[in-house]
Curated annotation (Swiss-Prot):
GO cellular component, as recorded: cytoplasm
Protein name stated in the entry: Ribosomal RNA large subunit methyltransferase E
Organism: Vibrio vulnificus (strain YJ016)
SUPFAM superfamilies per the UniProt record, alphabetical: S-adenosyl-L-methionine-dependent methyltransferases
Compartments where found: Cytoplasm
Main location class: cytoplasm
Keyword S-adenosyl-L-methionine: yes
GO molecular function terms noted in the UniProt entry: rRNA (uridine-2'-O-)-methyltransferase activity
Amino acid sequence: MSKQKHSASSSRWLKEHFDDKYANEARRKGYRSRAIFKLEEIQQKDKLLKPGMTVVDLGAAPGGWSQYAIGVVGDSGRVIACDILPMDSIAGVSFLQGDFREDAVLEALLERIQPDMVDVVMSDMAPNIAGNNSVDQPRAMYLVELALDMCRQVLAPNGSFVVKVFQGEGFDEYVKEVRNMFKVVKIRKPDSSRARSREVFVVATGYKG
């Protein structure tokens, strides 16, 4: 029974992927992933990224967001990316493979950032999905809390934060926490997000420090 369910789910994902105009466009343009279009749409609306900025990208692999960000911040800017998974190199992007929940990895990440402060913290992190919302949602909320804690450590005053969050238990409390730390907070659902997905992006500007 479970095997049939898994097969049906896999078939649906494959059909969506190959019928997906964003996935097709990403392949055509040589982008790392369709996720790049989500950040592109957020950038068009909120103008988070500017030339010369320093950006931290959490959960970076396969590199779509880093690829887009370095294209905006340019040679005078910096993108520092981190992920548990490997990521092929991107010109201008400093990538650290590891779990930043571990002290040694966090220290290595902070060493790459400091003594500078960061203009934008980005997180497209998501947990491995178990298929059980009572397990998946707390895992997802734990990751977004970690991303917010990274802001507390490295984000410059008036800096910006964009994070993928799954709507569900803990979502409203999290948004309230972000509002306490930033002057302006918006919830975005990019067109390139799949309609059935619970993901939204919390976009926060004007870090109070």
